[in-house]
């Protein structure tokens, strides 16, 4: 089985997920808003990353300033005649303005500075649970292995032990898998940059 994770997208969605506490009425537009934020960040990566670094994202201390800077950046481009104004992007901007006034974005506060994703092991365990009849061979990842060693997965009260970690240089199948994953990564990067 193959699974791909867009690290940038996954690192951004906590901003949008933090907004549901104050804007539950817009939950139906969740995917559109997340997509608009992702597309905007792809288009204006350097400027957004600068804001993230200055605010030690995802450990934002001054939520009001963080939200105001993101809002100003969106306003500067979303109102530009060269940039097609986007409903979801404007909705995000308005929601961020409110969050800034409340000084609250719960999922991007009180985290380790600059640590965008801490729990990669969840993606591994998810595969093991979804495909519980399969045996999963993962390339050695020491941090993930340590986290998974403390877990017990069950299906119908029966423990799951359908995974193992191996050194890629010792397993030809993992080497081939790494090669294919590398090619797919290049394809996805190309698609991100050209679509």
Where are these regions (language model features)?
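Phosphate-ester processing/binding pockets and catalytic centers
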Residues: 1-195
């Amino acid at each position: 089985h193959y699974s791909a994770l867009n690290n940038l997208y996954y690192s951004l969605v906590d901003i949008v997920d933090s907004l549901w506490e104050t804007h539950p009425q817009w939950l139906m537009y969740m995917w559109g808003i997340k997509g608009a934020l992702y597309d905007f960040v792809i288009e204006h990566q350097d400027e957004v990353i600068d804001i993230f670094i200055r605010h030690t994202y995802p450990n934002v201390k001054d939520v009001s300033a963080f939200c105001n800077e993101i809002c100003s950046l969106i306003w500067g481009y979303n109102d530009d005649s060269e940039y097609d104004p986007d409903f979801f992007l404007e909705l995000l901007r308005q929601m961020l303005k409110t969050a800034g006034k409340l000084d609250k974005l719960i999922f991007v506060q009180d985290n380790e500075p600059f640590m965008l994703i801490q729990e990669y092991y969840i993606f591994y365990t998810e595969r093991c649970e979804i495909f519980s009849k399969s045996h999963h061979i993962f390339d050695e990842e020491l941090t993930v292995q340590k986290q998974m060693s403390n877990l017990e997965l069950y299906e119908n009260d029966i423990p799951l032990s359908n995974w193992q970690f191996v050194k890629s240089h010792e397993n030809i199948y993992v080497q081939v898998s790494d090669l294919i994953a590398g090619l797919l990564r290049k394809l996805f990067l190309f698609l991100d940059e050209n679509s």
